[in-house]
Amino acid sequence: MSMSTSTEVVAHHWAFAIFLIVAIGLCCLMLIGGWFLGGRARARHKNTPFESGIDSVGTARLRLSAKFYLVAMFFVIFDVEALYLFAWSTSIRESGWVGFVEAAIFILVLLAGLVYLVRIGALDWTPTRSRRELVNPENSNSNRQQ
């Protein structure tokens, strides 16, 4: 590597190197400043959460219903759907009718999945029985008697 090419590389990347040095230095400065300026509480209640003057009751750990995880998964799925449809909509002139048919098939497959989720009761928020039990009441009654 000749001297001129290495100088060119340094000239092109000096701003990024300075950014990295400043970012790492700022992080270290904030951590060290917090360690020096922070209080040293060695009391019995150090690890209890602060509740704005109200005595804490119970633990800080809460059990979330599985419905929250389902909603998060549905959000990610439909967010990815929106991402694909946005990419398709920006290139609609280049893709033409073939792209339109492909996008329509994509939307229909996702709508079929949504209809399936609604039919099995995956989107119901009530903790009562699911729609599977409502569709087949004979099976649910025989299961309860056993």
UniProtKB/Swiss-Prot annotation:
EC number(s) stated in the UniProt entry for this protein: 7.1.1.-
Keyword Protein biosynthesis included in the entry's annotation: no
InterPro entries to which the protein is assigned, alphabetical: NAD(P)H_OxRDtase_bac/plastid (IPR023043), NADH_UbQ/plastoQ_OxRdtase_su3 (IPR000440), NDAH_ubi_oxred_su3_sf (IPR038430)
Membrane topology value: Multi-pass membrane protein
Entry superkingdom: Bacteria
Catalysed conversion reaction: a quinone + NADH + 5 H(+)(in) = a quinol + NAD(+) + 4 H(+)(out)
A Gene Ontology term for the protein's cellular component: plasma membrane
TM region positions: 16-36, 68-88, 98-118
Stretch forming the signal peptide: none
Location of this chain's protein in the cell: Cell inner membrane
Class of the enzyme per the UniProt entry, highest EC level: translocase
Record-level Gene Ontology MF annotations: NADH dehydrogenase (ubiquinone) activity; NADH:ubiquinone reductase (non-electrogenic) activity; quinone binding
Subunit and interaction comment: NDH-1 is composed of 13 different subunits. Subunits NuoA, H, J, K, L, M, N constitute the membrane sector of the complex.
Descriptive protein name: NADH-quinone oxidoreductase subunit A
Encoding gene per record: nuoA
